[in-house]
């Protein structure tokens, strides 16, 4: 600033440089006086470039460094198959492969000299014993539990439509059955410790609400979730600030309060009571298969 003042005496237009230099000077002064980031304190202004590069580093790796086969958990080749199938375009790549066919773990399918027709009904599993009046023929591969709220509206819709197209089941997650789950795909209704979608005002199991939802044609099986998979022995919580009116309605919880998933169930406390609870759910659902997830 002092230098600009001296130059101004000789050449007044130098004041225009303050339009550019002024903000940089202020940023530099703030960097030198702050106490949170040592990089900015030691390298005022230019130190911000480090954080900018850190911000865009995933994109740099994806577009300039990562090869078609080196990405994790899904490399570019695998992602491309998903993109192409979602657009209903050809997903095959002819003229050889870029993979190392001699690498450990490489998988392939050998040609058969006597190929046979594969009946899709033979690669399904019948779920439900003699006590089930409505057993379910389940696919070997299905969509695991992911609730609406953890996933977006469009994601849930896409998954359920995919379940319908592929003739496999879609697990709702413990967040209950949302309108976005009801796109025609078979459902496995997961019930957690919060009994979302079938609970009383004080968070206990509500048989009437359960019966109303479980008897829907789209619901094929019910899964009891015994505890939080990511933190067994502990509960979960959805802060009131993140609770929307739609999610509150779907989960049958009041607005303005934290939504708790307790560490354990209140409908049963012993293995024998669990078996009795399973019997109760089977009867309320009209004889559909009931299982539990450890």
Cite the ranges covered by each PLM segment.
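Conserved, well-structured core domains of diverse proteins
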Residues: 1-169, 175-185, 189-190, 194-230, ...
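Alpha/beta enzyme core
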Residues: 161, 177, 181-183, 202-294
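Short amphipathic alpha-helical segments with coiled-coil-like heptad repeat character
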Residues: 171-172, 282
